[in-house]
Each structure stands twice: as C-alpha cells, then as structure tokens.
A protein has these predicted regions:
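Conserved catalytic Walker-motif region of ABC-type ATPase nucleotide-binding domains
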Residues: 1-4
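Hydrophobic/anchoring residues in structured secondary elements
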Residues: 6, 31, 248-251, 288
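ABC transporter nucleotide-binding domains
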Residues: 6-203, 207-208
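Positions that flank functional sites
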Residues: 111, 129, 255-256, 291
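ABC transporter nucleotide-binding domain
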Residues: 169-263
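C-terminal coupling/interaction segments
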Residues: 263-308
C-alpha cells in the first residue's frame, strides 16, 4: 500500500497511508471505531476505489486487476452476508461455484473447510438455525474455500463466546505460513494474541507499526522493576535509590513486606537481587513490569488527539 487516501466528499476517511505485509505474515490492523480500517479493507478487496495512491495484493493492482485480486483474496467482512434459507453445504457449494470450483474439486474444498472450521455437526443445517458463532465459522469457511494466498478478516471474533474465540485464534495462527493474513479489529487482546505485527490507524492516519513487544517497548520510559522485599520501606527504598541509573522509586509497606516500583535506565533485577542478598533481605517477588499494548494504544491515540 502506497500513499493511499480516500475521501467521502470533504471527509478524509483514509489519509495517505503506506504499509507492506509480507508473505505468510499475520498482521493486525488495529484502531478505534471510525479509524478508517474498514474503508482501507474495502479498497484492498476491490469493493470501492481509493481517491489516490496505489495498492497491490498478491502482485495484482487493485485498481486495474480487480478480478485477479478478488481471486487471490479470501475476505470475511464483519457482518457476514449469508442466505438464511440455504443449508450450510448448499451455501458452500454455491460459493464454490462462484469461485470456479466444480465437481470433485469443489466437494474436496468443502470437506477441507468444513473440518478446518469445525462445521461437521451443522453442515446440513439451515443457516437460519445457526448461532452467531457458527455463522462466523461459515463466513470463515467461505473465505478459505478457494484456498487463497491472502486472507482479510474484518472483526472475525465479534459475537463469539470465549471458547470459540480461542478456537478461531488458533485457526488463524495455523493459516500462516501458507496464507498471508490481515486481521482488522478494535479489540486489543485479540490482535496481541494472534498477530506477529500490528499496524495502528487513527482518524485515517497510520500512527504506529511494529510487533507487540516493539510497541510496548516504545512506551516504556526506561526499565520498570517490581519487587517485594522483607523489611522497612524507608531503609529498603533508600538503598535502592543509591543504585546506578535509578530515576524513581516508589515504596509501600504491605504485611511486613516492602513493595517497590523501580524505574531505571536499564534492567536492575540482578542488581536489586544482589543488594538484597548482601543485606540479608528476603525477596519474594522480582520481575520486570512491561507496558501493555493497551497502554501504548491509549498513549498513541491520545497523542494524536493532542496534536490536532
């Protein structure tokens, strides 16, 4: 994607964004509601044109080779359009025929996606009788039917129960490296648990990109260590403040133990442990406190608001 923009009248829904997704990569497309995620996906799946910029999917230009792009993409929209009067197998046969699958190849494809999406128990049931979770599975099976190299999934776990969410996450992870996956969502834990890399979009602009650990690292101001040490807060806090690189120490007493939050230029876990051992202090907790993806997301979105 290069310098992609989309206007609706004077409203700028997508603002000059650029990014690349590699073969076999699972990338989360993350942003609050109204950020421009779905508009971008509609452009990449040839549902609507961009105002300016360029994009290729599986080597095909989305503006001049739309049929080739559609053939290379399995797309699952947020609200899966299904025919409620059809049975699941009947619907998949219909969709397979639209994809150019016939005869033995189509039935083999249906069997493959039925098993992969856990639809065996409902394959002959009318879609109107299916729960939200099973309808989502049918939509995912449809996207996988023609075994496309690229999968674009828009909010694939919305409406699913916790067990179904875990199963869907597992399935998406299994799809790599045979498929390139773009997963659009506004649900932070969903993206963090599933994706290798995250692209954050806000008000149409790409505001951050990186792996979950890289994004968390960006918000960390130095290294924060949490420790619980047996003893008086004043004595322990004073000793820790003398350690090299320490910029802040918060100490409080809990049931005879001192709980410390230590911010320093580097990871001081080993130094704190050595200090406690030398002074004869018992330690029952010592770990680095990493910033959460939620912290980063809130900071980046809030920062974008402040810049406006």
């Amino acid at each position: 994607v290069r310098n992609l923009s989309k206007y609706y009248g004077t409203h700028r829904a997508v603002d000059n964004i650029s990014f690349t997704v590699a073969d076999g990569e699972i990338v989360g497309f993350l942003g609050p509601n109204g950020a421009g995620k779905t508009t971008t996906i509609r452009i990449l799946t040839c549902f609507q044109p961009a105002t300016s910029g360029s994009a290729t999917v599986a080597g095909h230009d989305v503006f001049t080779e739309s049929l080739a792009v559609r053939a290379a993409v399995g797309y699952m929209p947020e609200n899966v359009p299904l025919y409620p009067e059809m049975r699941v197998r009947e619907y998949l046969r219909f969709r397979g025929k639209l994809r150019g699958l016939d005869g033995t190849a189509r039935e083999a494809a249906i069997d493959r996606v039925t098993q992969r999406c856990w639809l065996e128990d409902v394959i002959n049931r009318p879609i109107s009788q299916l729960s939200k979770g099973f309808r989502q599975r049918v939509g995912l099976a449809d996207a996988l039917l023609h075994n496309p190299p690229v999968l674009i999934l828009d909010e694939p776990t919305v409406g699913l129960d916790p067990t179904q969410i875990r199963e869907t996450r597992s399935l998406i992870r299994e799809l790599a490296p045979d498929h390139t996956v773009i997963l659009s969502s506004h649900i932070l834990p969903e993206v963090e648990a599933t994706c290798q890399r995250i692209i954050i979009i806000h008000k149409g602009k790409l505001v951050a990109s990186g792996s979950p650990s890289e994004l968390r690292e960006r918000i960390s101001e130095g290294a924060k260590v949490i420790a619980e040490i047996k003893g008086a807060p004043d004595e322990i806090g004073a000793a820790v403040r003398q350690l090299p690189g320490v910029t802040d120490v918060q100490a409080e007493r809990r049931d005879g133990w001192t709980r410390l939050a230590v911010v320093a230029a580097s990871d001081l876990r080993e130094t704190i442990a050595q200090t406690a051992f030398t002074r004869g202090w018992a330690v029952r907790e010592l770990h680095r406190d990493a910033a959460s993806l939620e912290d980063f997301f809130v900071k980046i979105v809030t920062g974008a608001h402040e810049q406006e």
